[in-house]
């Protein structure tokens, strides 16, 4: 009986020490820098700027959360920088996107970062919408059968970035698209579209809602298709944020030159799954103490638990899930895993289409 008493007492002391450690995490008077490896005009910027003030409200001590931007090499510059960070006090964060995941998946030689070293504390899904200028949209009727002879111009962040999703989709649909390579973020692609330099574009959901929907309302842009969303069975269905817009799968099925049963679509879907359902992930650096990790996990969980969270996030980011703690780790695992045959197809296609060798 005395032994049992000692065990119970010891456990109580351990729990008390853990609670004390967590209580000691205090960001009062501190500034947390959340680095986004893109320009300030894209979807990742809107995502981080949405969460930053909410995170400030819910972290112990209510620190100032500042979103910083480090564009370059399609996000590889910022990710390589974050890999070298050794801050353990919770004042440095990083936000990745599909354009950070894809070069990692494809073995891009510029990648010097390792996702397994980082600590994911929150992840969220998103969608994507492709759109046309009004003149081209006159020939789009749910298929691209009447658009085969047209030439489009698209601002592309890089062949191995998230832009491979629209690039492969347009190729499968038989569209002749000229790619202007090396823009620093999708917001720059939207600016090209607005100025008339580009005639076709795509944006992630948050950027579309804020930057493109006004163009649609003014008659200056017309939605073409979304990439879709995944249902519980892993099937592509309409994006809940844009339920009236057909998916790429629907457009492909209706277009003579496109097939949803061959290796092209299998590869496209595999990279779509890696790039969108859990696209944006918030990380702390390697070596971050568990009590700091727990403080972030608790803060993001409190944000998600707000009674108005679904409403305010839908308006700014779209209707997509948010993952916290262990859920964020599972989301990361899905984002950095892709079938070997899909990877092989895409690397071969990148070589033939863009002259990019990853071997």
Where on the chain are the PLM-derived regions?
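Short, low-complexity disordered leader/linker segments with a strong preference
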Residues: 1-29, 353-359
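Hinge/capping helix and adjacent helix->loop/strand transition within the periplasmic-binding protein
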Residues: 24-32, 57-65, 81-92, 104-199, ...
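Extracytoplasmic "Venus flytrap"
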Residues: 33-51, 72-74, 155-161
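Short helix-initiation/N-cap motifs at beta->coil->alpha
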Residues: 70-78, 180-195, 206-208, 326
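Beta->alpha turn/N-cap motifs
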Residues: 94-100, 106, 185-186, 202-210, ...
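C-terminal lobe and pocket-closing loops
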Residues: 212-304, 352-359
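Periplasmic-binding protein-like
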Residues: 236, 301-318, 345-346
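Extracellular/periplasmic bilobal clamshell ligand-binding domains
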Residues: 324-359
